[in-house]
Amino acid sequence: MTFTRLGSIQNMRIKIHCDASSNNQEDKISSTEGRVLLMENTESRKVNLFCWKAKKITSICRLVRGAETRALENGIDESIYFARMIHEIYSGKVDLKNPKQIQVKTATDNKSLWENLNNSRQCDEKLLRNSIALVKEMVERCEVETVDWVETLNMLADTLTKSGGSALWIKSVMEQNEL
């Protein structure tokens, strides 16, 4: 694993890949979430992978979209925390009433989740509506720049949630510091 200089804070953002697998734990009803966080220079596109996590989702998810939604919500929460902490480190200022942060850009490979976030229709699964509304609100408040859809082949967190996921792409990112 190598790290590269990313330059000034004005050109930095956190990029997060969130993924989930439904009903893949030993009990066959619990799901797994995974996330990979990168610091990215928005001009040079150079990245440093600095955090990854895989864990059991605490609530039972009926569908894959539910697991993906909860994984995205948890990943965004962690990303905003790091984005604010990085801004505090670089600026030397802490403002708890109006916290500043670097940009956060997210990625999911679940097309139906992405569609729910980018249209005005309500989600069919009523228990997910609050989570989807929260993510939409974070985008409106500019806590999250965008939620992008990526193909599963380009999902860095895929290897953290599935036994057959390929780790070649994430290995390449770690070695070359490029997406």
Predicted regions, residues:
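Extended hydrophobic-aromatic, low-complexity segments
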Residues: D27, R45-F50, A83-R84, N116
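Short glycine-rich loop/turn motifs
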Residues: M12-R13, S30-L37
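Amphipathic alpha-helical
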Residues: M1-L6
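RNase H-like nuclease module associated with reverse transcription
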Residues: T58-L179
